[in-house]
Amino acid sequence: MTWFIDRRLNGKNKSMVNRQRFLRRYKAQIKQSISEAINKRSVTDVDSGESVSIPTEDISEPMFHQGRGGLRHRVHPGNDHFVQNDRIERPQGGGGGSGSGQGQASQDGEGQDEFVFQISKDEYLDLLFEDLALPNLKQNQQRQLTEYKTHRAGYTANGVPANISVVRSLQNSLARRTAMTAGKRRELHALEENLAIISNSEPAQLLEEERLRKEIAELRAKIERVPFIDTFDLRYKNYEKRPDPSSQAVMFCLMDVSGSMDQSTKDMAKRFYVLLYLFLSRTYKNVEVVYIRHHTQAKEVDEHEFFYSQETGGTIVSSALKLMDEVVKERYNPAQWNIYAAQASDGDNWADDSPLCHEILAKKLLPVVRYYSYIEITRRAHQTLWREYEHLQSTFDNFAMQHIRDQDDIYPVFRELFHKQNATAKD
């Protein structure tokens, strides 16, 4: 019986390198599946893992096959139904076996279902927020916001095969073999010198010569038994996440909770803010978040009240903007903080208040913030607030606005608002 002894120190997750390669190869299909899956989740279940399905034809492997040209003769099993030049009808409906569940039942045909596999929470969030960043982030005097980046950190004795250092492993192998065989090689060299002297001496010393030859053979066998490479020699490139200091930042979340916002609209707004919160907490450290709810009056609240409070009322959007301006002046000096804001509303506002919102943003907030995003969640025609904000968008580069009609628009809009920009930071 043959026994295999696994001496690897990293016995767990032995197929991790294959899994990572698979995720890289089919990233486009996986991201498409994730963008579709996120719309089906509840607000509280956004950050868990996910079952991802990929069409079978998208994961087909390259293969060699015969070309279509040329003259070929083949021998096929005989049958009593078809003769040469007969045409075989294509199966109808589901008979083709595509696995999609479409069409009618058939007694023949075959195919494969979509490939389904599970990704972890970390893999899910990495793909969810890939290529996203806070726009116009500038390094200020006080650095408390920390972004983690991967850096080389020497070598380690365990790791995945993809990170193995061939040169360092061979150097360790040479050093080990030299250390283990140095004494034997010196002894071998001395025996070979003695053998040469005895072989040339007169009279011949056959017994002594035979003994030396036997010892030399044993020493050479011992030296050859030292393995060329051992798990002890293996070295892997080590990577670690190091804090990369950046500028401190604050995000203002302004949510309309007026009576015109029905429950489904509020749920879509909450989904957007949950994505924003996960993105900030996943990508940056020590980002401060200020939550503001407003109807006719605005109030700064904590995270729990922001997402779960049932308070409602009329609509005066400027109350939230005024409160944000007060908080900025009181706690967040624009010279030391990167200030961001994300506002969500259904666009329904008191008509006389919309010009005031334009004035507050243009004169007080937009000159001091790095980026201000506005999303309007409605299926109705845009009203005065949207039109006032359109003037701001044409004037200020750090103002962006998007329209969300239904749940499927949330994630694409979020990526559009926070995709990485190559533009230089605002001074």
From Swiss-Prot:
Residues 92-102 have a biased composition (Gly residues). Residues 79-110 are annotated as: Disordered. InterPro entries: UPF0229. Residues 79-90 have a biased composition (Basic and acidic residues). PANTHER family: UPF0229 PROTEIN YEAH. Belongs to the UPF0229 family. HAMAP family: UPF0229 (MF_01232). This is UPF0229 protein YeaH. The gene is yeaH.
